[in-house]
Amino acid sequence: MIQWFLKYRPRSLKDVENQDDAKKQLQEWIESWLNGNSNVKAVLLHGPPGVGKTVLAEALAHDYNFELLEMNASDSRKLQDIKSIAEKAAVYGSIFGTKGKLILLDEVDGINVREDTGAIQGILELIEKTKYPIIMTANDPWNPGLRELRNKAKMIELSKLGKYPLRRILKKICQAEKIICDDEALNYIIDSSEGDARYAINILQGIGEGYGKVTLNLVESLAKRKERELDPFETLRDIFWARYAWQAKNAATSAQIDYDMLIRWISENIPIQYDNIEDIWRAFDALSRASIFLKRAKSGDWDLLSYAYDMMSSGVAFAEPEKKKPNWKPKWKKYQFPSYIQLLSKSKDIRDTRDEIIKKLAIHSSFNKALNDTYPFFLLFYKKYDKHLNLNTKEKEYLSSISKS
């Protein structure tokens, strides 16, 4: 089952709704690039989720016969991943007989500038050296970590999708799928989606495929209004408590954490949610399949991302056969953070405490010299000299734990 927002996404710029100004700016930029007159090598498309940023880039590639070289920047974050894109663009010729290539770096605001060391610098180097136009997308372009990218790129804003354009999109899909949708139900979906076309189409598909029609009563009882900030605990509850596959999938695709982290959250809490060992096994089996699809999607076949979401959401949600019974009721459980996050947090806290001690030791030397030369010996004799360093309670506890180990 293919998702409708993928099945009916615009193929050409002329089919993209409500973004006339953005389309005009993008076409002017690509025309100047093709004519050799552009001083700007990259564009940063920005706007709320579901307004068509990625679709606009794909449609541009289609209309200008470019081979699209696509990478989700928030998933392939390391410097080496960025460089591999540059090498492919620079070295390998197109096998599709196209004019050239268009590089798409999706979700650059998903890059963690602290953890993903070198990723931003890698993109800057790619922009500097590229022989092909680059399009980046972001929900939040004003992230402080993206300042250098903003300076290098032409900023093009996509507006929130209006009610009338969204209505046209949904009406076309209803006609194509032969789904009867009441006007009141359509209005409710449009209001609930807050201009997010993907979210609105997911609701339409979930109810339309499940019931063959979309009425106000069905929408009001089954569809949640769009929430921009979904707590991970709320996302888990929506997945585990879902009565329908589309509800579980909506929860997963609306999560404010990336797919990898969502899998960690689900994995940690499967044994908490399910009591029956067979239910637990089925849930982990679905989650392992999600990981396989996700790995293949990241290698370039992004259509498989939909199947990854199916497995990590409805696959996990319906691991419990009891849910199919009409008298089934959800069980409230106290979910917990992934131990992976707790370990990272604890590890960082320990390193920070250690570094504070080393800074106190490095009064007359560099930090690295104190770390490599002074610190190892200090650990052997710290009890004699700790008073001279004005160590706080946390630092003393750290040293005490080191000596015991």
UniProtKB/Swiss-Prot annotation:
Gene3D superfamilies per the UniProt record, alphabetical: 1.10.8.60, P-loop containing nucleotide triphosphate hydrolases
GO molecular function: ATP binding; ATP hydrolysis activity; DNA clamp loader activity
UniProt-listed Pfam families: AAA, RCF1-5-like_lid
Record-linked InterPro entries: AAA+_ATPase, ATPase_AAA_core, P-loop_NTPase, Rep_factor-C_lsu, RFC_lid
SMART domains linked to this entry: AAA (SM00382)
Family: Belongs to the activator 1 small subunits family. RfcL subfamily.
Quaternary context: Heteropentamer composed of four small subunits (RfcS) and one large subunit (RfcL). Probably interacts with PCNA subunit PCNA3.
Role, per record: Part of the RFC clamp loader complex which loads the PCNA sliding clamp onto DNA. The complex possesses DNA-dependent ATPase activity.
Protein name, entry field: Replication factor C large subunit
Upper taxonomic lineage: Archaea, Thermoproteota, Thermoprotei, Sulfolobales, Sulfolobaceae
